[in-house]
From Swiss-Prot:
The natural substrate for this enzyme may be peptidyl-tRNAs which drop off the ribosome during protein synthesis. SUPFAM superfamilies: Peptidyl-tRNA hydrolase II. It comes from the Archaea. CDD domains: PTH2. Its EC number is 3.1.1.29. Its main location: cytoplasm. It is found in: Cytoplasm. Keywords: Cytoplasm, Hydrolase. Disulfide bonds: none annotated. One of its GO terms (biological process) is translation. This is Peptidyl-tRNA hydrolase. GO terms for cellular component: cytosol. GO terms for molecular function: peptidyl-tRNA hydrolase activity.
């Protein structure tokens, strides 16, 4: 095992006024979708990152953005950098309209790479 740390950053929109439970559910969706993406990707590097993250306790940080544009920017940067990333749109069954973008996840990946994308964001 290397000394490098691994984590996942989950980014949630605060401008939507979601309740705490709703925001937590959207964060969970983003986290799970990023893991599913890795498992389905066939990318050995991502699979290695996932395993290291799992072995190190699955560190997660939940961060906030204040707009759709900010959420899209985080997701786009992660994809451009070659990191596993998910982008969640709500199903519209409770508080939001169907298709409303709510959250994204970056990683699991080496912490230094995740921080390049999300390091300037505030905690949710």
């Amino acid at each position: 095992m290397t000394g490098e740390g691994y984590k996942q950053a989950i980014v949630v929109r605060r401008d939507l006024g979601m309740g705490r439970g709703k925001a937590a559910a959207q964060a969970a969706h983003a986290s799970c979708e990023a893991v599913f993406l890795i498992l389905e990707s066939g990318r050995p590097e991502w699979r290695r990152w996932l395993e290291m993250w799992r072995l190190q306790g699955q560190a997660k940080v939940v961060l906030r953005v204040e707009s759709l544009a900010e959420l899209q920017e985080v997701y786009s940067k992660a994809v451009e950098e070659g990191l596993p990333a998910s982008f969640v749109r709500d199903a519209g069954k409770t508080q939001l309209e169907p298709g409303t973008p709510t959250a994204a996840a970056v990683g699991p990946a080496p912490s230094r790479l995740v921080d390049r994308i999300t390091g300037g964001l505030k905690l949710f």
